Amino acid sequence: MHVPFVNLTIQFAELEEELVQAFRRIGHTGQYIMGPEVEAFEAALANLCETKHAITVGNGTDALELILRGYNIGKSDEVITAPNSFIASAGAISAVGATPVFVDVQDDLNLDPKLLLKAIGPKTKAIIPVHLTGNPADMDAILSIAKLHNLKVIEDAAQAIGAKYKGKMVGSLGHAAAFSLHPLKNFHLLGDAGFISTNDDDLANTIKKLQNHGLINR
């Protein structure tokens, strides 16, 4: 018997009428890029993550890359991350010209804080802990080490939307977080998408410019 890996048509059938109504509503506005629907969605995401800002982007990889660019991380810099994540975690680091440095994981499959100190060097600029399968990394330890070495902490929360760490929402713990809304994620859109959550006003303003070629309100 063939068992499909995933069958999104079942969910589509359940939501078809709502999706058609939404398509018509947006279609009649003539505003297919950004606009009030996206602004309302971003506000809801910020509320969910308990952050000041949520900025929608093309996908989770874009989210990571834009955060790195927003913090001017690039050529000759190093960024620490976990080796057992999807290739996008390291790929986003490479895309900005930086070098991914892998630190092994502990039994919960998340970045092992005890190994972080050995990996931090003069070129290290950030740590990207990956909250694998919705299980948050040991953020208290990671944030403490990052603060000691003046490093940015960028949460890879692609699989962890809605998760909590000691009562606090994933996405609100580090300097910024990247989320994926890919159809195979636990919370997804009809197509591919992602978003960034942050409480950093300067970063949010920079990403909003990077998000659309420097254009504002267009």
Model feature map: region roles:
Residues M1-Q31:
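N-terminal "arm"/small-domain region of PLP-dependent enzymes with the aminotransferase-like
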Residues T9, Q21, P36-A44, L48-A54, ...:
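PLP-dependent aminotransferase class I/II
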Residues Q31-E78, A92-V96, V101-V103, K168:
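Phosphate-binding glycine-rich loop
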Residues C49, G74, P122, G171-S172, ...:
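Structured loop/turn residues at beta-strand edges in well-structured enzyme cores
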Residues R69-A157, K164:
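PLP-dependent aminotransferase-like
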Residues A160-K166, L173-R218:
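Active-site region of PLP-dependent enzymes
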